[in-house]
UniProtKB/Swiss-Prot annotation:
Binding site for ATP: Y9, S10, G11, G12, M13, D14, S15, F16, T17, V18, L19
Family named by the database record: Belongs to the QueC family.
N-terminal signal peptide: none
Co-factor: note: Binds 1 zinc ion per subunit.
Primary role: Catalyzes the ATP-dependent conversion of 7-carboxy-7-deazaguanine (CDG) to 7-cyano-7-deazaguanine (preQ(0)).
Residues that hold Zn(2+) according to the record: C185, C193, C196, C199
EC number: 6.3.4.20
Biological classification of the source: Bacteria, Pseudomonadati, Pseudomonadota, Gammaproteobacteria, Alteromonadales
SUPFAM superfamilies xref list: Adenine nucleotide alpha hydrolases-like
Record flagged with keyword Ligase: yes
Catalysis: reaction(s): 7-carboxy-7-deazaguanine + NH4(+) + ATP = 7-cyano-7-deazaguanine + ADP + phosphate + H2O + H(+)
Protein name: 7-cyano-7-deazaguanine synthase
Biological or metabolic pathway of the protein: Purine metabolism; 7-cyano-7-deazaguanine biosynthesis
Swiss-Prot/TrEMBL GO biological process terms: queuosine biosynthetic process
Amino acid sequence: MSQKVVVIYSGGMDSFTVLHRALAEGNEVLALSFNYGQRHVKELEVAGNVCKQHGIPHKVVDITAINSLLSGSSLTDDIDIPEGHYEEESMKSTVVPNRNMILLSLAIGYAVSEEASAVYYGAHSGDHAIYPDCRPEFVRQMDVVSKMANYEPVAVHAPYLDVDKNAILADGIKMGLDYSQTWTCYNGRDKACGKCGACQERLEAFAANGIEDPIAYE
């Protein structure tokens, strides 16, 4: 049975796959993207192009005002983006305080307003060590709170919560997805740097699946 759902869609390969997984399940999808002052704002342009191509309703919400309250992340502040392998210590600087709770809260409110039954987002096991708001216990509790906080219960789904980026890409390949339509790099340049932790994890996923990454690198 088709349901209306909201997908938090950044434009990266994880949320791109989540978007198409929700569509493949037969859902009516509403895509929701956020500008929170991230350096890699190029991902929002990529997300818009994909939604336009597929006729998916797409809202981009500017929440950059929250940066007057939040600090300390290399994704939004004047702090160097870490290079090298996707390791816990080096990547902790990319944590935006309370980001997913903020984004999920807004997405849940949007879902209630649109009479949607669920919110999907792209948490996966590769993020568990680095991002507390991608861990199973967080997702479970957000699902509970979301169903309590409104008269209309909205479920929180993270379809790839228990698998890594390699498996996400494998599922996308099965669906025939074109990953040239995604952006992963944390640096906001014309081409992906290939050096930041996000690029490294992406490249490892393509190597593990035995295919070449279709995007251009510096």
